[in-house]
Amino acid sequence: PDSHYIEIVENFKALKSVWNAEGKEVKGKELNEREISSVIQMLGRYDVLFEATTIDMGLQSDDAIGRHKEAQAQNITENLTSAHHPSLVEESTQLQFKLRQLSNQLYIQFVLGVALLGKALQDATLYYVQRRPAELGCFRWVIDAKDKTTTGYEVLWLNMIRPILMSQSFEQPLNMLKGADYSSFQKFQGVLPKVPEFLMGVVNERTPYEYTDITKLLRDLEFRNSEEEPGIQLVDILCN
């Protein structure tokens, strides 16, 4: 939670000092069980929510992954017609091509990353509205960067994460707790008199049409190097 982030970082620095790692990047694989436990205990004093998505690669095959990737690529242009602006058609076609070019390993990472962000968004809103509703007024997404400069994969992920989650939200809107205080979250919600024409047939007809603005929710999203981001280091430790 933002309200405790600075305090959490300071406590993490104190732990690193005990480990003789002050000012250094700490990797989870470098810590022993006792040191990892101390991180978990420290985070346990705050309303920290930990999410993970996993896959058993032993149950997957290259053919199955390839078919899944191709199906996702086809979905990008499935609903495009001559009525759409040529620039949108061109952009969508380029995204489709780049997705198909991903290796199966990167594609799996792509899918898990999308699933994780969507799951974190749903669970975090329900979790914090019951504990710290003011936290729902700001969302900052920081992702571990692969290199010092943004990679082609990361650019593709950034270009696709918003439309993918937006499409998912049409069919599965965020679950919201009845009677809870969502006043801080109102800035991310919108209301239209009816379902927009471009969504006719995609979502169920309802008046008024209430929706969550995924673009606003993901506005503050960036890839950062783990060396300069304590939060990413903490996630790496928890994942080990």
List the predicted regions and their residue ranges:
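Phosphate-ester processing/binding pockets and catalytic centers
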Residues: 2-240
